[in-house]
Amino acid sequence: MKFLALALTILLAAGTQAFPMQADAPSQLEHVKAALSMYIAQVKLTAQRSIDLLDDTEYKEYKMQLTQSLDNLQQYADATSQSLAPYSEAFGTQLTDATAAVRAEVMKDVEELRSQLEPKRAELKEVLDKHIDEYRKKLEPLIKEHIELRRTEMEAFRAKMEPIVEELRAKVAINVEETKTKLMPIVEIVRAKLTERLEELRTLAAPYAEEYKEQMIKAVGEVREKVSPLSEDFKGQVGPAAEQAKQKLLAFYETISQAMKA
């Protein structure tokens, strides 16, 4: 039991001495605090697991004391971290104030470098423009020569193509006439065949047409024969009635004339 307690004590002591604090910079101090907190938490967890292995009947009181000691150690670490916070902020302020002069010197050097480099930049631009102009002068004749060569080649190609195009145009006209000459017999054959078929149809339809014509003439004659008596009868009936109506109208007119004179 004493050996276990001694081992825990040595472990905790080693843990507290494992990360010496350095005051190099605020970031370093923060790293130390974070590492110390993490290490203490791991030590507490390991020790608690070891304590849990002890028999509650025999070591109950001792387990409670060790657990309390671990809690006190955690609280001490938290209090230490909080107590270091003002020193960390103060150190950061001191560091900022201490480096103000250095930062001012750096900014001054940057401005001086900018002032010194501005003419150099103009000189560099001038040199680059000069080199580009030299390259342009070297390349421009070659480019012009290439363009002229292509233009000459195009002119030569056009000169070669013009007579061929004219020849093809003349051949097209001749070929059209030749095609027409070959096509006309085919057209005449088709036309003759169509004419023949039409004549055959006309020949086949002629008897039917004559028969239909004769039937129409016969029907018209029959209608005329049937209508003629009716027409004469109607005329005979209408004639006397029309004469009577005429006499009545003349008498009515005479009566009105006499009345107007009186």
Swiss-Prot record:
Keywords: Cholesterol metabolism, HDL, Lipid metabolism, Lipid transport, Repeat, Secreted, Signal, Steroid metabolism, Sterol metabolism, Transport. GO terms for biological process: acylglycerol homeostasis; cholesterol efflux; cholesterol metabolic process; lipoprotein metabolic process; phospholipid efflux; response to lipopolysaccharide. The keyword tRNA processing does not apply. GO terms for cellular component: chylomicron; extracellular space; extracellular vesicle; high-density lipoprotein particle; low-density lipoprotein particle; very-low-density lipoprotein particle. InterPro entries: ApoA_E, Apolipoprotein_A1/A4/E. Residues 64-262 are annotated as: 10 X approximate tandem repeats. GO terms for molecular function: cholesterol transfer activity; phosphatidylcholine-sterol O-acyltransferase activator activity; phospholipid binding. Participates in the reverse transport of cholesterol from tissues to the liver for excretion by promoting cholesterol efflux from tissues and by acting as a cofactor for the lecithin cholesterol acyltransferase (LCAT). This is Apolipoprotein A-I-1. It comes from Oncorhynchus mykiss.
